[in-house]
């Protein structure tokens, strides 16, 4: 968040690291850890506090206002998608907390994650191959370092287990594009 200054950029990088954790977990296990989502919320709260204490309270208040509206809207829409089986609860929570941080860029974030999700559907065979290879190497790395995975990656189970999309990847891609200003010259 450029509005929050240098600290905002620092906190954005921390959030991107947590988003990467959520996306990899979603790819491997079709599960976004609550710990990742809660950690993002805590980083966002710390960023707002740092901005307010650092004399940038106006920017913090602006983000709090616009971000809250977007987050609540995404939670409501996401809850309806969850009820119909179209989206997982972890995806909804992750999209909501990232919509908060995106603030005034939340619409662009939501458009981008939808577009990336659509591309994932078109490239489903490639996605399945990536899931299988990632799962294979994650297991091998765990064994090599003496820390085997607690459960089998979804890509190695195949069949019905691979049903659905790891939408955390689309959420992460959309968020990263907004944070790095990939489309800022267009919008």
What are these language model-derived features?
Residues 1-187:
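A membrane-topology feature that recognizes alpha-helical transmembrane segments
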């Amino acid at each position: 968040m450029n509005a929050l200054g240098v600290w905002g950029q620092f906190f954005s990088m921390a959030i991107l690291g947590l988003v990467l954790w959520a996306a990899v977990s979603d790819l491997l296990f079709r599960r976004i850890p609550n710990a990742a989502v809660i950690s993002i919320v805590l980083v966002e709260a710390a960023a707002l506090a740092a901005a307010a204490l650092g004399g940038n309270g106006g920017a913090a208040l602006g983000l709090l206002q616009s971000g809250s509206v977007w987050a609540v809207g995404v939670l409501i829409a996401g809850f309806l998608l969850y009820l119909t089986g179209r989206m997982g609860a972890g995806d909804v929570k992750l999209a909501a907390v990232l919509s908060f941080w995106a603030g005034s860029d939340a619409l662009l974030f939501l458009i981008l994650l939808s577009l990336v999700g659509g591309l994932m559907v078109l490239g489903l065979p490639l996605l399945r191959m990536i899931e299988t290879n990632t799962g294979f190497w994650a297991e091998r790395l765990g064994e090599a370092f003496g820390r085997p995975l607690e459960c089998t990656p979804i890509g190695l189970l195949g069949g019905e287990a691979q049903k659905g999309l790891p939408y955390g990847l689309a959420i992460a891609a959309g968020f990263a594009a907004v944070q790095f200003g990939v489309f800022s010259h267009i919008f």
